Amino acid sequence: MAETVEVLVPGGRATAGPPLGPALGPLGINVKAVVDDINKKTAEFNGMSVPVTVMVDDKKNVTLTVGIPPTTALVMKEAGVEKGSGTPNTQAVGNLPLEAVIRIAKMKMESMLSYDLKTAAKEVMGTCVSVGVTVEGKTAKQAIAAVNAGEWDEQLA
């Protein structure tokens, strides 16, 4: 029977320590080789937490599945901030151009409940509310209202 281990690791910086080592060690596989493979596959997400699923079958074959980081991590990376605002409704810590919102929406589209780019972009803008990041200089709520009013229909088509 195959064993599955799901962990959240720092992109490009996974180690054989917790949470990976203790979970993979008892499975009798080369933990260092798996960690090196994870680091190669997550290098582009450097500094972000990345969900990784490691599946080990009965013959000790390892299959890695690397997910996409949480939307908050992508928003903060694009905005160039380390930490979200402690008071997101009153104090903004960064600003995203619409292009960055669209890029994140396209990345996350598969795992979102949205059927089109416009609603996916509004979901990303909703995340901006909780992090304290503005969109095109507007609060995320104002940006969502602008999308609803059709202000950015051309870019979101």
Swiss-Prot record:
Keyword Ribonucleoprotein on entry: yes
Annotated Gene Ontology cellular component terms: large ribosomal subunit
Superkingdom of the source species: Archaea
Keyword Ribonucleoprotein: yes
Entry keywords, A to Z: Ribonucleoprotein, Ribosomal protein, RNA-binding, rRNA-binding
Molecular function per GO: large ribosomal subunit rRNA binding; structural constituent of ribosome
Annotated PANTHER family: 60S RIBOSOMAL PROTEIN L12 (PTHR11661), LARGE RIBOSOMAL SUBUNIT PROTEIN UL11M (PTHR11661:SF1)
Name of this chain's protein: Large ribosomal subunit protein uL11
Organism per entry: Methanocorpusculum labreanum (strain ATCC 43576 / DSM 4855 / Z)
Gene encoding the protein: rpl11
